[in-house]
């Protein structure tokens, strides 16, 4: 094998990748990690009907803690599939960022904005104007 690439590197550990493919981590540009909590709840429906049912479930169980736990699950699944960076949008984005940090992932995230009341009854105007 050709080791010239690594001659001037100060690696703590050298791993032989002979016979394998080495590639950078993938980037998931559309992620709702904590939605992993609702997998299998509603399937094969048009988007509007699917959202209507999922939002009822979200309103019933989502808290900062359950969002964190769902994010850990969803982000771990991303890591296992090769994604090391995600762009996530979900309720309680601070909890999703904490989950990503705890797992060693890179993340970009933001809140949810639309013209319907969300978790906790907050409207778009409430989000724009601040806490």
Where are these regions (language model features)?
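Hydrophobic/aromatic beta-strand patches that form the interior of the parallel beta-sheet core
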Residues: 13-15, 27, 108
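Short N-terminal targeting/anchoring amphipathic segment
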Residues: 16, 28-30, 85-87
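Histidine-rich, glycine-flanked metal-binding segment
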Residues: 1-23
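Residue-level detector of flexible, active-site-proximal loop/helix-junction positions
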Residues: 21, 44, 114
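Active-site beta-loop-alpha junctions enriched in small/polar residues
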Residues: 32-34, 91-92, 112-119
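Alpha-helical scaffold segments that flank or form the walls of functional sites
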Residues: 39-105
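Metal-coordinating catalytic core of metallo-dependent amide/deamination hydrolases
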Residues: 97-131
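Histidine-centered catalytic micro-motifs
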Residues: 25-36
